[in-house]
Amino acid sequence: MEPMSNKQDSNSSEGDEKGWPDVPKRKRKNSQCSMKSMSALSVSVPGYIPSYLEKDEPCVVCGDKATGYHYRCITCEGCKGFFRRTIQKNLHPSYSCKYEGCCIIDKITRNQCQLCRFKKCISVGMAMDLVLDDSKRVAKRRLIEENREKRKREEMVRTLQIRPEPDTAEWELIRMATDAHRHTNAQGSSWKQKRKFLSDDIGQSPMVPTSDGDKVDLEAFSEFTKIMTPAITRVVDFAKKLPMFSELPCEDQIILLKGCCMEIMSLRAAVRYDPDSETLTLNSEMAVKREQLKNGGLGVVSDAIFDLGKELGQFNLDDTEVALMQAVLLMSSDRSGHQCMEKIEQCQEAYLLAFEHYINYRKHNIPHFWPKLLMKVTDLRMIGACHASRFLHMKVECPSELFPPLFLEVFEDQEV
């Protein structure tokens, strides 16, 4: 390399008078840029060139293709990294030049003289104070993460704030469903005080095997069937108090009731799960344990209802939410055989929207509350399907006189 005069690049700094403008017009190439702008414009994607650079704009240090503003100057990635390492590791005091500090620095010679390259960096205006040491870099990274989390929280709050709540028509729909539930839900909120526990002696009777491998305690089965008729009647009364349901043809009403009856009764039992006594309260009057319900005819369906009761405890549902779940289960358009499918779909959609908007109004603290609650509707549909299969086995194995007429009317001829 030949010694040369200390001629500076024509793009050398003329001072730090103004910050970099928001548009790509500029009078000088090395004007001061705020830390925020530099951070936003830093190159993180290989080959990415910021829009504010002119086409093939050169690095003011070596003339290679520039990639953006780095430490207050337009430079290439190589000179940016060289300058950062030099400052962070305090290497510049050890740099020396064989040619008295007069080397020309370009993209071919830049790696041959560290001192002249560093001097060129300084002379064109690269700022040493903008290079962060390890502690400052960690602090900056932490601040970036904190700001990112803060933006996420603010976005979540904004999202919650714009979630729609019920309009006037939906409030009326919600009111009618809630009233229908309260008027057909025996004992109301005082069910714990009025319930009666099924005697532990129930279950000592001879067990009758069924064709699906389970066994049935006929005494327990008899006790359960006694409360089935009033429980079914209450579900029917609930449905009839909903104007949308009453407007459907009688044939469709029957199909919907036969399909949802076990699902709604299971929901009403599940929301009255008591973790202290580990019991469900059936029809708001009889508290039963898991094994009693299982041996009394429900088999594995008993496990599903008890598990649902445990899970629903964390949701802290109020009467309105239980009522709207029942309305959604009732208005299931996928029950086969009904005539007015489109109208039933519209009814279910109306209840679903009112339900979702009411959930927004309640502002539960559980993340993703609405989709999690909808999964419980799916669980109830599965319970209904399992019970339909279980009923077929029970009807074959248990004495016909144990089945109340309304019980048979509702659960016979169901889809399995």
Curated annotation (Swiss-Prot):
Residues 15-24 have a biased composition (Basic and acidic residues). Keywords: DNA-binding, Metal-binding, Nucleus, Receptor, Transcription, Transcription regulation, Zinc, Zinc-finger. Signal peptide: none annotated. Residues 169-413 form the NR LBD domain. GO terms for biological process: cell differentiation; negative regulation of transcription by RNA polymerase II; positive regulation of transcription by RNA polymerase II; retinoic acid receptor signaling pathway; thyroid hormone receptor signaling pathway. Residues 1-37 are annotated as: Disordered. GO terms for cellular component: RNA polymerase II transcription regulator complex. A zinc finger (NR C4-type) spans 59-79, 97-121. Residues 59-126 bind DNA. Gene3D superfamilies: Erythroid Transcription Factor GATA-1, subunit A (3.30.50.10), Retinoid X Receptor (1.10.565.10). InterPro entries: NHR-like_dom_sf, Nucl_hrmn_rcpt_lig-bd, Nuclear_hormone_rcpt_NR1, Nuclear_hrmn_rcpt, ThyrH_rcpt, Znf_hrmn_rcpt, Znf_NHR/GATA. It comes from the Eukaryota. Residues 1-13 have a biased composition (Polar residues). The keyword Transcription applies. GO terms for molecular function: nuclear receptor activity; RNA polymerase II cis-regulatory region sequence-specific DNA binding; zinc ion binding. Residues 1-58 are annotated as: Modulating. PANTHER family: NUCLEAR HORMONE RECEPTOR (PTHR24082), THYROID HORMONE RECEPTOR ALPHA (PTHR24082:SF42). Belongs to the nuclear hormone receptor family. NR1 subfamily. This is Thyroid hormone receptor alpha-A. It comes from Paralichthys olivaceus.
